[in-house]
Amino acid sequence: GGDSIFETYETEFNKLELKDTDVCIFCHDDIHILDTPSAFVWNLKTAFMGEDVGFVGAAGTKYLGETAIWWDMELWKMGMHSGRVKHIDPEGKTYITDYGPPMNVAVLDGLFLAATANTIRDVGLSKPDWLTGAWDFYDIYYTSKALMQGKVNKVMKVDILHRSRGELVGRMSWHENRQAFINN
């Protein structure tokens, strides 16, 4: 663990002895991959085919609007989002959020992120000083940085269950980091 998700990811990543092409996965602790292991590995390897792949994830958007909210409803209506995630509501019922088909995207949600060790080293995992919250907006920061470096972020086909809805109620740090991201 650490004092922030940035510190935790950086500390744990640095403990690994990875070759540049090894793939490292960062994910929430409340997800479950429902694909068979062989299907998951096949889809992950397929997503990394091609040159300059940055991050691969389960959900994201082709366009991050001025609000910096990747799941923006207006952009969703325009077909800008990608991915499919099963969630569990407060009553324990499973429902599916279908953002759109797998495609290349600008940014990805941090629910599930995969990247080669080389990409992770290029992007870096340290928290920038201008992000004040310790646990929020790392996903948009990392994946937008990869995009700005000329890498291609992708949503892959993955059957994934998220045991929460990603609730923001009472999470001022998410709103503060979002505003800091917009300002920088």
Language-model region placement:
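Active-site nucleotide-sugar/metal-binding loop of Leloir-type enzymes
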Residues: 10-23
